[in-house]
From Swiss-Prot:
Organism name: Oryza sativa subsp. japonica
One protein family per Pfam: RNase_PH
PANTHER family reported for this sequence: POLYRIBONUCLEOTIDE NUCLEOTIDYLTRANSFERASE, POLYRIBONUCLEOTIDE NUCLEOTIDYLTRANSFERASE 2, MITOCHONDRIAL
Signal peptide per UniProt: none
Keyword Transferase in record: yes
Record-listed E.C. numbers: 2.7.7.8
Function: Involved in the 3'-end maturation of mitochondrial mRNAs, rRNAs and tRNAs. Functions as a poly(A) mRNA 3'-5' degrading phosphorylase.
Any one annotated GO CC term: mitochondrion
Protein name: Polyribonucleotide nucleotidyltransferase 2, mitochondrial
Superkingdom of source: Eukaryota
Keywords: Exonuclease, Hydrolase, Mitochondrion, mRNA processing, Nuclease, Nucleotidyltransferase, Repeat, RNA-binding, rRNA processing, Transferase, Transit peptide, tRNA processing
Chain residue ranges for the region called Disordered: 792-814, 832-892
SUPFAM superfamilies: Nucleic acid-binding proteins, Polynucleotide phosphorylase/guanosine pentaphosphate synthase (PNPase/GPSI), domain 3, Ribonuclease PH domain 2-like, Ribosomal protein S5 domain 2-like
Transit peptide: 1-39
Length: 982
């Protein structure tokens, strides 16, 4: 029996091994196939023993509910069991862990609530290794700070008054990868806020929750609950709403000019759906929650408060009644009152009252200002409840910048600047949801001098990040799409002076700066802050009376109940942020606040339109230039390794993305230089029949290889060099020479075939050029072989001056601003190189083939000088000479009579010889070669002349191009030197 049991155990273990490591052939039924008879006894023996008495068993609790067709669950007891409270919330494949911990000391350590909310998105959540040097998680990102604010703002008002113990809420986003994996559709910020509420409910920390948080979108006029990231891209509303069962706690909105009525409908729907998150938290807290711990509440006694109120109420009311006080004068007067009360308490040695002095005086200030506003409708600066402070707008504050504006509202002043950059300057976002880059940024800065304080500047500040993001959301709705305006835009908002509502002032200043930069925004965006002062019925806890304040001061923000920031255009709202101090405000009051905000916003927009109402011209000197070039993906590979080099050489910014190259430069010359380098490096798609510029890279017996179109090689066969027969390639072209060539196809091997003669006119085309022009020509403008006005010299007696540079023979001719230079032919240049460099071998000149046919002009010259010419040949030569003379006379007859008097020494190309040309003769020549320093010009009868480029002269010539030139001098060999005529 024991052997049978041992065999069964062995087989059972083998079954377990097969279950863990499946083999191609497995026993059907696995281990269950052997559990019969004695096997059942073995199974009972192998079962895990029951836990010893007193040992805790891991137990988890779970609550599920549904919102918008998606199932959401709260789970506790499985993870982070040592924390004061921990909850894992799940929706689809997104899971968020929220933990809560409080300081162990029962004594308060501060006179305010030291609440800290840390939100983290670990890179492992999306299956990515961090890109930092140490491959660890880096400092908190902007998105993490913003999500932390989303959690902090609704839960902070629900802590009991006087609870000043340190509390920390930790949120770590965890996306668990299973066989399906996560698609990253859900933004976890709303889930984290709900999980934090549930964790606080489970903990022993006193907190008057729970809350419900929900996101609402709108697509094609229909509201969507908890939309995905893709749905938010189609939505014109992104509303994050937090509430208790009957009051609103937090609102955060980004919209595309939604109307006040539609926004109210969205908030009412959000409230009804967010309440569904509350009951599951209550059920979970009832099953697994801890008993609330008794903490010592830091509250002043009624006796001490009455004593301080009696000493300070009258002088405080006197200060608030005087509307002539400014921010700092009022603050100094209130501080003097506090010091006076402190001196009296010190005389009486009232230590209990001194301990809560500042808190009690602040409470007295709040009661005085509330009573004055509610009963009399008067504010501390003398304004009416719906009155906006004086406005000041100024655009183009610093014209050298791309865009700048200065905006002031009362004592609040903000300087906004705009900087435009290339698409590659866009901010790269390393978040688990959302787009990978952001092309529009608004950075808000609150320096200490704006409130006349001394402080150290640290890293990212949550307040600065939050205010900058709010203003960025407000302006994003009016920006042109990326296809119309591909620039990266950065707005920098510097607070110069602060007395309330600096974020809304940043919206106004940023809108004017965008227009000043020439960005085609549709219209202005303005923002204003709305406040609330209310009285609460102590018996019911409801608000009995209230007043809505428009454009609140910093003091009214501090002593009031609400800071409701609303930004938008005349069409509707683009951004909203609501922060409150009491434990919730009814939604009806919030909806009522939208109307006074709309009126104030339109008033501010009117003043902004008076300063600048539309975008300025974008082509001024301060605006950068942008060009977009399209290439194939294969061609762009050449640019990836040379992009940085082009940027260093030109100073332009080059961005490569999806077959498109975007170049941004400060000036047009820099832009042209960068485009030239990019096109030369990448090249264009080669088309048969299209003309390209190329550089001769090597010369062979059968032709020349030319580099063109971004480094591509083409063959210029010897038969494509000229319409006439060529015996040697080097007689026509040389290495390094720039040519204009036409693509004529490919050979059997796939090599690109180029042609030079396709760009040159035939002999009969050149002959008939003059006879085709019959229209009268304007003064100083010549087409073809027509003469031009000879520009006289300023000094008729001036002698030609010759440079001391005998090698280059640079000559200057009177009456011509461009210096004329003797430029030798290719053979002469080679001979000169050998003379200058004795080590260089003289190139061997091959004898001409006896079968080489000479040009027609040379053949005519031979016939005129040979004693053996026939009578038929003589007749033909005379006939050709007569036709050329008649064509020149026809051209001269086509010139108006008033211009003929200005023509001097015109020589027809068929009437002159190299020995008969005179200084001042005006002729039409053809570009024969293009050198780095000048042109080799071809005249008739085999005569060639030269022209040198000026230092900054025009160098855009093509081989075969006809130019109008004037003979300015001759060199020692009798070669004519020409200067160009405009």
């Amino acid at each position: 029996m024991s052997m049978a049991v041992a065999s069964l155990r062995l087989l059972a273990r083998g079954g377990r091994r097969r279950a863990r490591f499946p083999a191609p052939l497995s026993v059907p039924g696995g281990r269950a196939a052997f559990l019969s008879g004695a096997a059942e006894e073995v199974a009972q023996a192998d079962a895990p023993p029951p836990p010893p008495p007193g040992r805790k068993v891991l137990e988890s609790f779970r609550e599920e509910f549904e919102i918008g067709g998606r199932v959401i669950s709260f789970e506790t007891g499985k993870m982070a069991r040592f924390a004061n409270g921990s909850v894992v919330i799940s929706m689809d494949d997104t899971h968020v862990l929220s933990t809560v911990a409080a300081a162990k000391s029962s004594e308060p350590v501060r006179d305010f609530l030291p609440l800290t909310v840390d939100y983290q998105e670990k890179q492992y959540a999306q299956g990515v290794i961090p890109t930092t040097y140490m491959r660890r998680e880096g400092a908190p990102k902007e998105r993490e700070l913003l999500c932390g604010r989303i959690i902090d703002r609704p839960i902070r008002p629900l802590f009991p008054p006087g609870f000043y113990h340190e509390v920390q809420v930790m949120n770590a986003t965890i996306i668990m990868v299973n066989v399906i994996s996560s698609d990253g559709k859900q933004d976890p910020d709303v889930m984290a806020a709900n999980a934090s509420s549930a964790a606080l409910m489970l903990s022993d920390i006193p907190w008057n929750g729970p809350i419900g948080v929900i996101r609402v979108g709108r697509i094609d006029g229909n509201f969507v609950l908890n939309p995905t990231v893709d749905e938010l891209g189609l939505s014109d509303l992104n509303l994050v709403y937090a509430c208790s069962r009957d009051k609103t706690l937090m609102i955060d909105v980004q919209a595309r000019e939604i109307t006040e009525r539609d926004l109210q409908a969205g908030m009412k729907l959000a409230h009804a759906e967010a309440v569904k998150c509350i009951n599951p938290q209550l059920r979970l807290a009832k099953r697994a929650g801890k008993k609330k711990k008794e903490y010592k509440i830091s509250l002043i006694s009624d006796k001490s408060y009455e004593k301080i109120r009696t000493l300070s109420e009258a002088p405080i009311e006197e200060v608030f009644t005087d509307s002539t006080y400014g921010k700092f004068e009022r603050g100094e007067a209130l501080e003097n009152i506090t010091q006076s009360v402190k001196a009296k308490l010190e005389e009486e040695c009232d230590e209990d009252s001194l301990k809560f002095l500042h808190k009690a005086v602040d409470t007295v200030r709040k009661q005085v200002i509330r009573k004055r506003i509610i009963e009399k409708g008067l504010r501390v600066d003398g304004r009416q409840l719906d009155e906006v402070r004086p406005l000041y707008c100024e655009s183009s504050t610093y014209p050298i910048l791309h865009g700048s504006a200065l905006f002031s509202r009362g004592d609040t002043q903000v300087l906004c600047t705009v900087t435009l950059g290339a698409p590659g300057d866009a901010q790269r976002l390393d978040s688990i949801v959302g787009p990978p880059t952001k092309r529009f940024m608004l950075h808000y800065s609150f320096p200490p001098f704006s409130i006349n304080e001394v402080a150290k500047r640290g890293g990212l500040n949550r307040r600065e990040v939050g205010h900058g993001t709010l203003a960025e959301k407000a302006l994003l709705a009016v920006l042109p799409p990326e296809g119309e305006f591909p620039y990266t835009v950065r707005v920098n908002s510097e607070v110069m002076a602060s007395d309330g509502s600096t974020s809304m002032a940043s919206v106004c200043g940023g809108s004017m700066a965008l227009m000043d930069a020439g960005i085609p925004v549709r219209e202005h965006v303005a923002g204003v802050s709305v406040g609330l002062v209310s009285e609460v019925d102590q018996t019911t806890g409801d608000i009995s009376s209230y007043r809505i304040l428009t454009d609140i001061l910093g003091l009214e923000d501090h002593l009031g109940d609400m800071d409701f920031k609303i930004a938008g255009t005349r069409r509707g709202i683009t951004a909203i942020q609501l922060d409150i101090k009491p434990a919730g405000i009814p939604l009806d009051i919030i909806c009522e606040s939208l109307e006074p905000a709309r009126k104030a916003r339109n008033q501010i927009l009117d003043r902004m339109d008076q300063e600048i109402s539309s975008a300025r011209a974008f082509n001024d000197g301060s605006s950068p230039r942008l060009a977009t070039l399209s290439f194939s993906s294969d061609s762009l590979r050449k640019l990836l390794f040379h992009r940085k080099k082009i940027e260093q050489e030109t100073g332009a910014r080059v961005s490569v993305s999806d077959g498109t190259v975007t170049i941004v430069a400060k000036t047009q010359p820099i832009m042209d230089k960068a485009i030239e380098k990019v096109e030369f490096l990448v090249g264009r798609e080669i088309e048969v029949g299209r003309t390209y510029k190329g550089v001769v890279s090597s010369i062979k017996e059968y032709g020349a290889f030319v580099e063109f179109n971004g480094g591509q090689q083409g063959l210029l066969h010897i038969s494509e060099l000229s319409h006439d027969k060529v015996s040697k390639v080097s007689d026509v072209v040389s290495v390094g020479q720039v040519l204009s060539l036409t693509c004529i196809g490919q050979d059997l091997r796939g090599n690109i075939k180029l042609s030079l003669k396709a760009t040159l006119p035939h002999a009969h085309e050149k002959k008939d050029l003059a006879s085709n022009h019959t229209d009268p020509l304007p003064s100083q403008e010549v087409v073809g072989w027509t003469a031009v006005e000879n520009m006289p010299s300023k000094d008729a007696n001036a002698e030609p001056s010759i440079s001391k540079d005998e090698d280059n023979m640079i000559e200057e001719t009177p009456g011509c601003s461009t210096p004329a230079v003797i430029i030798r032919s290719a053979a002469e240049c080679d001979a000169q190189d050998v003379t200058n460099d004795p080590k260089k071998k003289r190139p061997k000149v091959a004898k001409s083939s006896p079968k080489l046919s000479k040009p027609a002009s040379e053949r005519q010259e031979v016939k005129r000088t040979s004693a053996k010419k026939t009578s038929g040949a003589s007749t033909t030569a005379k006939k050709n000479k007569k036709e050329k003379a008649d064509s020149s006379n026809d051209v001269l007859d086509a010139i108006p009579e008033q211009n003929k008097s200005n023509i001097m020494n015109y020589s027809s190309p068929s009437n002159f010889r190299s020995g008969s040309m005179k200084l001042g003769d005006v002729v039409t020549a053809k570009v024969y070669q293009i050198r780095a320093y000048g042109l080799v010009l071809e005249l008739s009868d085999g005569v060639r002349g030269m022209h040198k480029f000026a230092e900054n002269g025009h160098k855009d010539f093509e081989v075969g191009e006809e130019l109008l030139v004037k003979c300015s001098s001759f060199n020692a060999k009798g070669i004519p030197v020409f200067s160009l005529l405009d």
